[in-house]
């Protein structure tokens, strides 16, 4: 009897000749296949320990389940539920969804057999539980005897999630500034070179490989192995720094300098399209970090929508302000223009005259001016040539005539005429000349 199923094995071990294989070895093989199939089909009872938000100490392999009964609230957006397994020696931890999957782990199968060798063996590991996950189960297997371990369930505010959210918010709102910053360009290039140096080497090797070459299979395996090494290093970074800090520091300095040299050779981005692509990439990365750092999906979606609206809010606000100004100008009374005083009129006339004369000199000295055609149309070519060279544009005689007509003498004459006309009035009229002030 195996799992409630009767197995008949007489045909594999009974006497008499059999045609299942040479030397009767096929009968034993058939027996093993039947027994293995029955073991896979059979079901075993699983002893499961229900976890609470506390600590449990064990000294044997055991299965655990945690049932989340609390409904997440809006203030739990950065709350994380973790199951920590801390042991004195190496243990293997497997996470599944429910008890049925735990029963499948207890049954023999080829997949479970090979996957047991691929799973990491750690003495301190964390299992994250989603806030909306109703149940999470895990299996702790002891590798060595005399191993003790503790299983702790915690529900607390995670500052890492908050920092990731701030990083995503910064990338989204400052992506256009960061894409044009040289400091961001060099720091990002050095960081990528330090973290993914092995991936970059494999990528450079693939550039020299011929197309349709079998070596691409090895390169794909190299990519996967490199990603696995990066993940493994980050998980054990603290231990690596404690034991091999001098090698790690030498690696960071060497690869960082090489990455800086490569970035310096190519220089920051100058093409506007490339800058736009980098900006959009940073903004999408920021939105992804914001969504992944918030544990409640609908709150994360709402915050992303608010961020998108806020980012593009300047355009509708600018349009509304310009529309409001146009409406105010259309509905309001026209404001009469302010008239210039005599002093302002005189100053403006002098400034504009000098400006126009200078522009005329520049035009006459430019290749666009036809000198012979201009000279043929004027009465005094020498005077025109002196003016182009910087001489005054009026002769002394013209200045004298202008002063007699519009200068101080003409002003006194006008004042005398006005005084004689107003002698019979009761109150005399005084005329103020702004040219004298």
From Swiss-Prot:
- UniProt-annotated location(s): Nucleus inner membrane; Nucleus envelope
- The source's domain of life comes to Eukaryota
GO CC annotation terms, alphabetical: nuclear envelope; nuclear inner membrane
Q: Which GO terms describe its biological process?
A: erythrocyte enucleation; erythrocyte maturation; nuclear membrane organization
Q: How is it modified after translation?
A: Phosphorylated. Phosphorylation may regulate its interaction with RAN-GTP.
Query: Where is there biased composition of kind Acidic residues?
Result: 415-425
Looking at the UniProt entry, the stretches that span the membrane are 159-179, 183-203, 214-234, 244-264, 288-308
Biased-composition ranges for Polar residues? 428-437
**Main subcellular location:** nucleus
User: Does this entry carry the keyword Nucleus?
Assistant: yes
The alphabetized UniProt keywords are: Erythrocyte maturation, Glycoprotein, Membrane, Nucleus, Phosphoprotein, Signal, Transmembrane, Transmembrane helix
Question: How is this protein organized at the quaternary level?
Answer: Homooligomer. Interacts with RAN-GTP. Interacts with EMD.
- Similarity comment: family membership: Belongs to the NEMP family.
Protein name in the entry: Nuclear envelope integral membrane protein 1
Instruction: Record the organism.
Output: Mus musculus (Mouse)
Taxonomically, what lineage is the organism? Answer: Eukaryota, Metazoa, Chordata, Craniata, Vertebrata
């Amino acid at each position: 009897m195996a799992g409630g199923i009767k197995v008949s094995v007489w045909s594999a071990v009974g006497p008499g000749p059999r045609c299942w294989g040479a030397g009767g070895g096929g009968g034993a093989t058939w027996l093993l296949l039947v027994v293995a199939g029955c073991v896979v089909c059979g079901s075993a009872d699983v002893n499961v320990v229900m976890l609470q938000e506390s600590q449990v100490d064990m000294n044997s392999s055991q299965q655990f389940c945690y049932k989340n009964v609390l409904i997440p609230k809006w203030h739990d957006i950065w709350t994380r539920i973790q199951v920590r397994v801390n042991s004195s020696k190496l243990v293997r931890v497997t996470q599944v969804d429910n008890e049925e999957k735990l029963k499948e782990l207890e049954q023999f199968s080829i997949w479970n057999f090979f996957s047991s060798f691929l799973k990491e063996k750690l003495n301190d590991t964390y299992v994250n539980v989603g806030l909306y996950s109703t149940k999470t189960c895990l299996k702790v297997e002891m590798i060595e005897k005399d191993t003790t371990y503790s299983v702790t369930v915690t529900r607390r505010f995670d500052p890492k999630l908050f920092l990731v959210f701030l990083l995503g918010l910064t990338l989204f709102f400052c992506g256009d500034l960061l894409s044009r910053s040289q400091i961001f360009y060099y720091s990002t290039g050095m960081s990528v070179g330090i973290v993914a140096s092995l991936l970059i080497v494999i990528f450079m090797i693939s550039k020299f490989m011929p197309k349709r070459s079998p070596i691409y299979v090895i390169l794909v395996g190299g990519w996967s192995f490199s990603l696995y090494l990066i993940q493994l290093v980050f998980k054990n970074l603290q231990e690596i720094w404690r034991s091999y800090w001098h090698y790690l520091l030498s690696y960071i300095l060497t690869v960082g300098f090489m990455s800086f040299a490569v970035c310096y050779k190519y220089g920051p981005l100058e093409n506007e399209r490339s800058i736009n692509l980098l900006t959009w990439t940073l903004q999408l990365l920021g939105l992804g970090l914001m969504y992944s750092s918030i544990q409640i999906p609908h709150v994360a979606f709402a915050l992303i929508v608010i961020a998108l609206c806020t980012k593009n809010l300047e355009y509708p606000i600018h349009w509304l302000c310009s529309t409001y100004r146009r409406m105010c100008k259309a509905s309001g009374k026209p404001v009469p223009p302010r008239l210039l005083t005599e002093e302002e009129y005189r100053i403006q006339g002098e400034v504009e005259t000098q400006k126009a004369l200078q522009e005329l000199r520049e035009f006459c000295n430019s290749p666009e001016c036809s000198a012979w055609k201009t000279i043929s149309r004027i009465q005094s070519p020498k005077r025109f040539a002196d003016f182009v060279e910087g001489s005054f544009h009026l002769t002394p005689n013209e200045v004298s005539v202008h002063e007699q007509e519009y200068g101080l003498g003409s002003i006194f004459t006008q004042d005398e005429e006005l005084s004689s006309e107003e002698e019979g009035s009761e109150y005399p009229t005084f005329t103020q000349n702004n040219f004298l002030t």
